[in-house]
Every structure is written in structure tokens, then in C-alpha cells.
Design a protein with these regions (language model features):
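Active-site gating loops and adjacent loop-to-helix segments of metal-dependent hydrolytic enzymes
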Residues: 1
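Active-site loop segments of alpha/beta catalytic cores
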Residues: 4-198
Length: 198
């Protein structure tokens, strides 16, 4: 069962973020990491279980996705109203080239992810969408091309899309972001401090 907003875990999260916000005041923005619902279900159960239910179009899975999304939406509201979060950092997953087909994501999962993003945008104009590429598997970026956000962030090394090209590609963002390569074997792992700074 999902926790209520009165659950100690939820309240602890809100308390910690509120203390952080009070400590830094307006010195910097504060973003909270809110994964999409299917990623939460995968980490709570297993990839195999979720993908098996997805392939069979099990109604129970879609009911679970809906419930998780509803919890996340309510939690985002509390993060902003009670804890003073600036916006959300919304990692998108389950749309990579090694997973099920892009059409499957578009038809079955995209509506849930988009509704989560839209609710975040209703609560705050300062949300960042992150397109996960950590494991080095390229994403089907076309499924996220029109997601609205203040900033779109992706792994330029995995998805082979430069920031300049991404500025044109993503149609409903205000800004683009991209970081250094953070995978094993990259300079962040192997180089000395000087090389990392450069």
C-alpha cells in the first residue's frame, strides 16, 4: 500500500526539505527528484514483474501506475506548499532502445508520464525533465520531444544529441541542460582534479 501524506516517511521528507529551504533561504533553488511511476514500481518490485505485466496489458498494473502517479502528484503539491521546493527534477525512463518498443511506451506509459509533468508544471514553472541515459542505452527521444518544462536535461553522450541541436529538437522547453560524462571509464572516474575541471 502507498503511504498517506501523514506517514512518517513522507513527513520526514517534508521536514528535511523544509529545514534545507530555511537554511539556504533564497540563496539557491531547491529541486526534488520525482521519478515517473513505472520506474518507482520497477524499483519497488522488479523489472521482470513490471515488464511481464506490461506485455500482457494487465489491468492491475495500470491501476497501480495510476495510484502511484496520484501519490506523486499529491506529494509534489506538499513539497511546494509545505516544504518550499522551487520545482521538480523529473527523471524519465522506460523508453530506451533496449526496452519494449517505442510505440508501446507512447501508447501505454507516456500518458502517465505526461500527466505527472503537467501536474508539476501546474504547481511550479521551474521544473526540470531529465531523460535518463545512465546505463549507456540511447532513448527514443521522440516520445519526450514535446514534454513541457522550464529545462530539458539529457545525456548528450548516450543520446548523441548536442545541446545546440536539442535546443531545436525539444519543442516545449525554455532552456536545455546537459552534463559531463558520468559513466565508469569517463574522466570523472579516471582523471585528476585538473582534468575534470577543464
Amino acid at each position: 500500500a502507498l503511504p498517506s501524506m501523514d506517514d512518517p516517511f513522507v513527513q520526514d521528507q517534508l521536514t528535511h526539505i523544509k529545514r534545507l529551504r530555511e537554511a539556504i533561504q533564497d540563496e539557491t533553488a531547491v529541486f526534488y527528484n520525482v521519478f515517473n511511476p513505472v520506474s518507482t514500481l520497477r524499483s519497488s518490485t522488479s523489472d521482470e514483474l513490471v515488464y511481464d505485466h506490461l506485455e500482457r496489458r494487465e489491468p492491475a498494473l495500470f491501476e497501480a501506475i495510476t495510484r502511484v502517479n496520484e501519490f506523486k502528484m499529491e506529494f509534489m503539491h506538499r513539497l511546494i506548499s509545505d516544504a518550499g521546493v522551487t520545482g521538480m527534477f523529473l527523471p524519465m525512463q522506460n523508453n530506451d532502445l533496449n526496452g519494449f518498443t517505442g510505440a508501446c511506451y507512447h501508447e501505454l506509459l507516456r500518458p502517465y508520464d505526461l500527466s505527472l509533468v503537467q501536474e508539476a508544471n501546474r504547481l511550479s514553472p521551474y521544473n526540470i525533465i531529465h531523460l535518463c541515459g545512465y546505463w549507456g542505452v540511447p532513448n527514443r527521444l521522440e516520445n519526450w520531444k514535446d514534454f513541457p518544462c522550464a529545462a530539458m536535461h539529457w545525456d548528450v553522450h548516450t543520446d548523441k544529441l548536442s545541446l545546440q541541436d536539442g535546443r531545436k529538437y525539444f519543442t516545449k522547453k525554455k532552456a536545455v541542460m546537459g552534463g559531463f560524462n558520468n559513466k565508469e571509464g569517463s574522466p570523472i572516474y579516471l582523471a585528476d582534479r585538473k582534468a575534470v575541471i577543464e
